[in-house]
């Protein structure tokens, strides 16, 4: 009787399970099952002592890596718009600053806090939302935080005093930091390392286009309808993006998806299923996740010269961009006497430069692919830097050009065109340095990116606060030259790391540990049994490429790196391709936006 009842229940489950997964089901059901998923021969016996190990099936419809290119690029564009919206919200506020000053009877330095504290909120992103997304998934964190961003934007429109407005702006920035932090992770979840370069190049334009478009939209809207309409528009725009992303963007984070699948399989079958990733890595508590996320970025920032110098360079450039939101109105409204809306149009010059940079980065990706092939899949991190060499020179050229052509006697187009080399250089510097840091710190990449983001956000928050005073005391020419001199002082950094990067990395503790990890991975792959036939699939681990040095000359730092798991376990999680090439290509699978707590577990313990 019990057997018949069990068979009936199993039959009902089978009938209720979709054989193909419709897209809406991917969005609303992270652990969606099909009969094929249930019948898959998972390793194990389904007991507490020997649970079934849940892994992706071949061509698994729920695995983001196997989705169609159309779906991947559609989602890439969607998350890019979500980051563009946040960046636009950060700067569009400047379009209503004059009206805010007049209504609340405050000075420009207090009104500017609406921008500064919003950007300061960005520093919270990698410290708070990144570990939460690794615990609960990217989808739920995005949905909740973007809803809060929309609410705080809408609340700003009804603020009755300046401090209410400023505090609401801070919370909007803090919650808006979530898509800025997690959107790159969504792209890394879907694209293999070789495909990720172009996707990230196109995606990277969004966080820069937003701040440039913001003053233009805010300027005209503030001039014609008032600052409350600016805030109202930002609330409506972010709300529309929130609705679109909530409806169309599914969960993409593999550890969470496999965990949900294991939970649902256990519930449906009565057997014990556990995600293979959780078995290999272990479940991380929320306390441990925050401990790592809050401490490790600071250790890397202040102990690693590579991280500190390149993060400082990016922070100066980022701060300069936000400084221009106060500088352009001074130059074009105060000196050239343009109205509030028209004086925001010069930001289009920066946007043109950004578009050229994105085009150039797509073209340069072909060069990088060739270098990667030449090194057998282990292109050195320094191969990422050639575009940065050009860009580092373009930035001070654009800034000095702007500083000394903003005389009223010189035609306005000359001054506006100065924004093009600055925008061109800014995007390429950011892309080149971010990729270099990821490649040089593979297993520490998430923490390095967090350190970079925090320092960058602090500079972006501080620079606008002293801009007005600087222009009043120094005049428009010398004040505009200050960031140009700072950028000029940073020009040697990319050249230094391009020429001596390999040597410097050996002398940096955590860069050396990362390199030692990659050597061990390469060595274990060499020692692994060769495929029995030519058609056997071999793995390509998704990582950012790093050099494959002579493994016979392993530094002492290797002793601090934990033994890699058995290479056959890695194969079970790796993406595969046919072994048709003559040279083995090995890549680290880790997502650069995820904190590696397995291979770095002992790296930050006190000695």
UniProtKB/Swiss-Prot annotation:
Chief location category: membrane
* Acidic residues bias locations: 553-564
Q: Where in the cell is it found?
A: Cell membrane
Q: Species name for this entry?
A: Aspergillus fumigatus (strain ATCC MYA-4609 / CBS 101355 / FGSC A1100 / Af293)
State the Gene Ontology terms under molecular function. Answer: transmembrane transporter activity
In residue numbers, the region (Disordered) covers 523-583
What does the record say about its membrane topology? Multi-pass membrane protein
Q: What is this protein called?
A: Major facilitator superfamily multidrug transporter mdrA
Q: What is the lineage of its organism?
A: Eukaryota, Fungi, Dikarya, Ascomycota, Pezizomycotina
Gene that this sequence comes from: mdrA
* InterPro entries reported for this sequence: MFS, MFS_dom, MFS_trans_sf
| Gene Ontology BP annotations | transmembrane transport
Q: Which UniProt keywords apply?
A: Cell membrane, Membrane, Transmembrane, Transmembrane helix, Transport
Q: What upregulates it? A: Expression is up-regulated by exposure to human monocyte-derived immature dendritic cells. Expression is increased in clinical azole-resistant isolates.
Q: What does this protein do?
A: MFS transporter involved in the basal level of azole susceptibility. Confers resistance to voriconazole and, to a lesser extent, to fluconazole.
Judging by the UniProt lineage, the source's domain of life is Eukaryota
Instruction: Point to the regions of Low complexity compositional bias.
Output: 572-583
């Amino acid at each position: 009787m019990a057997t018949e009842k069990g068979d009936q229940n199993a039959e009902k489950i089978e009938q209720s399970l979709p054989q193909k997964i419709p897209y809406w089901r991917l969005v609303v059901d992270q652990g969606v099952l099909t009969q094929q998923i249930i019948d898959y021969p998972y390793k194990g016996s389904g007991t507490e002592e020997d649970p079934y190990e849940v892994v992706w099936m071949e061509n698994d419809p729920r695995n983001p890596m196997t989705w169609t290119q159309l779906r991947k690029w559609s989602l890439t564009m969607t998350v890019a718009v979500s980051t563009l919206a946040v960046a636009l919200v950060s700067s569009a506020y400047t379009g209503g600053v004059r009206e805010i000053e007049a209504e609340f009877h405050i000075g420009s330095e207090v009104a500017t806090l609406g921008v500064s504290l919003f950007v300061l909120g960005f520093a919270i992103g990698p410290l708070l939302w990144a570990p939460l997304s690794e615990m609960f998934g990217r989808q739920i964190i995005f949905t909740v935080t973007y809803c809060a961003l929309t609410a705080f934007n809408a609340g700003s429109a009804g603020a009755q005093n300046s401090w209410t407005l400023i505090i609401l702006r801070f919370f909007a920035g803090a919650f808006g930091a979530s898509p800025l932090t997690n959107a790159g992770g969504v792209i890394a979840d879907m694209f293999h390392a070789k495909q990720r370069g172009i996707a990230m190049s196109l995606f990277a334009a969004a966080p820069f286009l937003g701040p440039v478009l913001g003053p233009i939209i805010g300027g005209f809207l503030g001039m014609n309808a008032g600052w409350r309409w600016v805030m109202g528009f930002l609330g409506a725009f972010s709300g529309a993006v929130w609705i679109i992303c909530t409806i169309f963007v599914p969960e993409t984070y593999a550890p969470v998806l496999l965990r949900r699948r294991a939970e649902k399989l256990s519930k449906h079958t009565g057997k014990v299923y556990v995600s293979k990733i959780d078995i290999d890595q272990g479940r991380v508590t929320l306390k441990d996740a925050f401990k790592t996320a809050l401490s490790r970025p600071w250790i890397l920032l202040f102990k690693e010269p590579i991280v500190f110098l390149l993060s400082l360079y990016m922070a100066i450039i980022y701060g300069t961009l936000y400084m221009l939101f106060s500088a352009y109105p001074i130059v074009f409204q105060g000196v050239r006497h343009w109205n509030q809306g028209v004086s925001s149009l010069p930001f289009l010059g920066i946007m043109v430069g950004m578009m050229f940079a994105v085009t150039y980065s797509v073209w340069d990706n072909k060069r990088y692919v060739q270098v990667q092939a030449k090194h057998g899949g282990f292109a050195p991190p320094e191969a990422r830097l050639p575009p940065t060499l050009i860009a580092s020179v373009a930035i001070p050229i654009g800034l000095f050009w702007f500083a000394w052509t903003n005389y009223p006697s010189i035609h306005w187009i000359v001054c506006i065109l100065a924004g093009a080399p600055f925008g061109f250089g800014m995007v390429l510097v950011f892309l080149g340095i971010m990729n270099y840091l990821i490649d040089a710190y593979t297993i520490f990449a998430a923490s390095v990116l967090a350190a970079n983001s925090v320092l960058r956000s602090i500079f972006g928050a501080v620079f606008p606060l002293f801009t007005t005073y600087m222009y009043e005391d120094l005049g428009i020419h010398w004040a505009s030259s200050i960031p140009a001199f700072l950028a000029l002082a940073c020009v040697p950094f990319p050249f230094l790391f391009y020429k001596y990067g390999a040597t410097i990395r050996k002398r940096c503790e955590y860069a050396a540990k990362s390199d030692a990890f990659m050597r061990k991975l390469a060595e274990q792959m060499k020692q692994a049994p060769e495929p029995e036939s030519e058609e056997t699939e071999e793995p390509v681990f998704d990582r950012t490429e790093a050099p494959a040095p002579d493994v016979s000359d392993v530094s002492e730092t290797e002793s601090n790196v934990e033994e890699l798991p058995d290479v056959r376990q890695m194969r079970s999680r790796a993406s595969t391709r046919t072994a048709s090439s003559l040279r083995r290509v090995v890549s680290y699978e880790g997502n650069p936006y995820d904190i590696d707590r397995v291979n770095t577990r002992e790296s930050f313990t006190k000695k």
